[in-house]
Amino acid sequence: MKPAARVSVGLVLAFLGACVLAAEPAAAARADPAKGEAISSGTCVACHTNDGSRGVAANPILQGQHADYLVKQLSEFKAGKRENAIMKGMASALSEADMKNVAAFYAGKQAKPGFAKNKDFATLGEKIYRGGAADRAIPACAGCHGPNGAGIPAQYPRLAGQHADYIEAQLVAFRVGLRHNSEPMTGVAAKLNDREIKALSDYVTGLR
């Protein structure tokens, strides 16, 4: 092998070695659900229950929610991009690693189904969720949240099984400007009336 070739091979091997070393911290920083559970049991349990299940209807169900989405919301509570005095106080004490650990804990729980309660709203809720309202430029909710309400990690939350009261409160908050950390949702909610919001909220909680 010529000297120049040996030098080139050596540089390639050195580069590959550097890549491996650079990847090690990322692996070490992987979220730890056990640490998340420890934080949850001391900080989150009062409002969200031990496993993030069906607690008070005013508070969201966290079990089975996408980890990336939960981290985004915690980060935005901490930064003041999403307003809630209680959650800002809780999130402010969390590091980025803490948030990832807590999110991994809740995301690892099995999401449980909910049940729609108002049959009178079923048709209207399904119509908007699956087809939107073209005359008012309202897109189908299923386009972002999925046909079964499973959502898209980081961007759009799981809605299936969520408290109807919580969903209704968030849609109203988007509509009136109390919540503004999602431009798409602000635009959609602004076009929904009270009956449509109630119908959607009740419908999506029963999605499977």
Residue ranges and their predicted role:
Residues 1-6:
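N-terminal secretory signal peptides that target proteins for export/translocation
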Residues 43-50, 102, 138-147, 200:
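The canonical Cys-X-X-Cys-His
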